[in-house]
Each structure stands twice: as structure tokens, then as C-alpha cells.
């Protein structure tokens, strides 16, 4: 499989619809409303709704809380469309978890009672860290040993900014990726600096509470309870940050990460800096031949990753679906949104 690049220790998966579950942890961070910080919505205000609508696309195959799917300001569609098409193609089961919804999706989800994460430049990001971790622990116990492979994915607009702030707080000065073609690094840096002036916290869990988001905390809780199954963190530099934190806090084994080539080649150094390269599987997707222009834009540095898109592609390829069949399923599914 030339379109899957495995690290030295990441080619270890046996995948089928019975032994694998896809868990989407979706939630809002008020960071996403800062102008220029993310393209995960047509306007900063609409980014608050993206996690709920992404969840509806994954759960129902359509938008119920909005006429249209989440789009970038340029009109490029949410990666949830890609992920849902692949999950439908492979028949892999999914679970949606409330990681701090601003608006509740109109599809079944695991209710954690979590509220949106705050902008850390203004106040503590996670109001009840223990509750978020505890919710994750319960979910982890439910899944552990039932499935051989547990994919943890996210829909958190602004999450590369919270990831950057958390890493910087614990002494890792590395750039995260972005859903935008041009990374708004100066804005991320300003938010981190304002957050540190408000309160400086250098411990891993303390940094998650002060500068992170609920998705991070729920993921850490899930991992702490999973002893028998493999976990694949499905995502880009957000989930790389979670995996690194998981090592520091939980010290778990059988943990891997899968992302798209668009993220990996944008921020290759982050994965090596965090010591994750050996446990990484890169989905080197090629959208240049997609039927619809909105999808072709992915090939040129827009969006890059989200809702576990890279991990979903990995699962399909491991199940011996040809790349062209995967691309066709995405094109066909996107038709209904046009």
C-alpha cells in the first residue's frame, strides 16, 4: 500500500467491522470564535456549531441542525463528509461523545454533561477537569476488550491552538498544524501568551485544565481505562498532543496515531519532536482527481484533517478497499450536499 506510510512499530493492525470501533469526541472551544484562528466554519460564530453538525453527518448521514454542512470561508466542506463516506463503505461502527457541545446534535450520542471549553486567554479552559476525565474513564471501561481497535477522533474547531498552548506550557515549543492553508501562528502565539499571563501552569494535567479542551481530557480518561485494546489516535497535531500527554500522564502502551499526509508533511517535525514517528501511520490520500472542486482543494493545503479522516482511510485500506473505491464513495456521498 503505497498510500499508507507506517512507522517502525505501527504496522500492527488487524481490522474488520467486528473488532473495530470509531469514537468521535466532538465539542466546542471558545477559541474558535477568535477571528482568523480556524477555517472550520464559514464565520467565527458558526464554528461553535461545527461539532454538532459534524456529529449529525457521522450519525445520520445528513445535516439536521443546519441547511448546509460546515464549510470553510472558501466553501470547502467539512472532513466529516469524508469520514462518514468511509465508515459507511467499511461498515465500521461508531460512537459519538459529547466533548462540550455548544448545541446538541440531533443524533444519538453519549452524554457527558460537559459544557463548551473556554478561551484560555480569558479564563480556565476546562471548568471541571475531573468530570471530563471521569466520563472518559467510564467510556474506556465499556469499550476495553470488547474491540481490538479503538479509534479516538475529534471535532474541535480551534483545537490546534489549544494543543499549541498546552505543549508550550509543558516546555515543547513546536508549531501545530492548522485547518487554514496559511497557519495563523501569530494568533496562536498571542493566545498562548495571554493565557500564560493569566495563569502559568507547567504540569501536564494542569496545562490541559488551563489551556486545553474537553476533548483532550475525555481522551485521556478513555485511554487510562483501556488496558487490553489498541488505541489509534485519529487526527493531526491535536491528537498527537493527546498521545504525547497520554504517555506522560497514563504511561500506556499499544497506542498509535494515524493522520493524513497533508498534516504530516506540513508538520513532520512535531511528530518526531514528540517521539511519535515510530507509532504513526500516515494516510497519503490524493484528492487531485476528485469530481468536486471543494474536495480537490484538500490536495492544496486546505483543511488537512478532522473527524479522524486519516484514520478512517487507514482502516479502509487495511480492509483491502482500493483507494479509487474509497475516493468514489466520498465523491458520491458529497453529491447529496451540493
UniProtKB/Swiss-Prot annotation:
- Classification via CDD domains: DMB-PRT_CobT (cd02439)
What domain of life does the native source organism fall in?
Archaea
Q: Which InterPro entries did the record assign?
A: Nict_dMeBzImd_PRibTrfase, Nict_dMeBzImd_PRibTrfase_arc, Nict_dMeBzImd_PRibTrfase_sf
Molecular function (Gene Ontology), one example? nicotinate-nucleotide-dimethylbenzimidazole phosphoribosyltransferase activity
Belongs to which family? Answer: Belongs to the UPF0284 family.
Name of the protein in its database record: UPF0284 protein TV0153
The opening ranks of the lineage are: Archaea, Methanobacteriati, Thermoplasmatota, Thermoplasmata, Thermoplasmatales
Q: What organism, scientifically named, is this protein from? A: Thermoplasma volcanium (strain ATCC 51530 / DSM 4299 / JCM 9571 / NBRC 15438 / GSS1)
Amino acid at each position: 500500500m503505497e498510500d499508507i506510510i507506517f512507522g517502525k512499530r505501527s504496522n500492527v493492525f488487524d481490522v474488520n467491522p467486528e473488532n473495530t470501533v470509531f469514537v468521535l469526541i466532538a465539542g466546542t472551544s471558545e477559541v474558535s470564535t477568535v477571528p482568523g484562528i480556524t477555517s472550520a466554519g464559514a464565520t467565527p460564530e458558526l464554528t461553535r456549531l461545527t461539532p454538532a453538525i459534524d456529529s449529525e453527518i457521522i450519525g445520520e448521514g445528513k445535516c439536521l441542525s443546519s441547511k448546509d454542512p460546515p464549510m470553510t470561508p472558501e466553501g470547502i466542506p467539512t472532513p466529516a463528509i469524508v469520514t462518514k463516506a468511509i465508515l459507511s463503505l467499511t461498515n465500521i461502527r461508531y460512537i459519538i461523545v459529547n466533548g462540550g457541545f455548544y448545541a446538541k446534535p440531533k443524533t444519538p450520542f453519549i452524554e457527558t454533561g460537559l459544557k463548551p471549553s473556554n478561551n484560555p486567554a480569558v479564563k480556565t479552559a476546562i471548568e471541571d477537569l475531573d468530570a471530563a476525565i471521569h466520563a472518559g474513564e467510564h467510556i474506556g471501561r465499556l469499550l476495553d476488550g470488547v474491540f481490538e481497535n479503538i479509534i479516538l477522533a475529534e471535532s474541535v474547531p480551534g483545537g490546534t491552538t489549544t494543543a499549541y498552548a498546552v505543549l508550550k506550557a509543558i516546555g515543547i515549543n513546536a508549531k501545530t498544524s492548522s485547518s487554514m492553508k496559511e497557519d495563523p501562528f501569530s494568533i496562536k502565539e498571542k493566545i498562548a501568551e495571554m493565557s500564560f499571563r493569566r495563569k502559568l501552569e507547567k504540569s501536564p494535567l494542569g496545562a490541559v485544565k488551563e489551556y486545553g479542551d474537553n476533548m483532550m481530557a475525555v481522551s485521556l480518561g478513555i485511554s487510562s481505562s483501556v488496558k487490553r485494546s489498541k488505541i489509534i489516535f485519529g487526527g493531526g497535531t491535536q491528537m498527537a498532543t493527546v498521545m504525547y500527554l497520554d504517555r506522560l500522564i497514563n504511561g500506556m502502551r499499544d497506542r498509535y496515531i494515524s493522520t493524513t499526509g497533508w498534516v504530516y508533511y506540513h508538520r513532520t517535525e512535531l511528530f518526531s519532536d514528540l517521539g511519535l514517528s515510530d507509532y504513526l501511520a500516515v494516510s497519503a490520500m490524493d484528492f487531485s482527481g476528485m469530481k468536486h472542486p471543494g474536495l480537490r482543494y484538500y490536495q492544496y493545503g486546505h483543511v488537512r484533517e478532522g473527524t479522524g479522516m486519516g484514520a478512517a482511510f487507514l482502516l479502509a485500506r487495511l480492509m483491502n478497499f482500493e483507494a479509487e473505491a474509497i475516493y468514489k464513495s466520498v465523491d458520491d456521498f458529497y453529491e447529496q450536499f451540493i
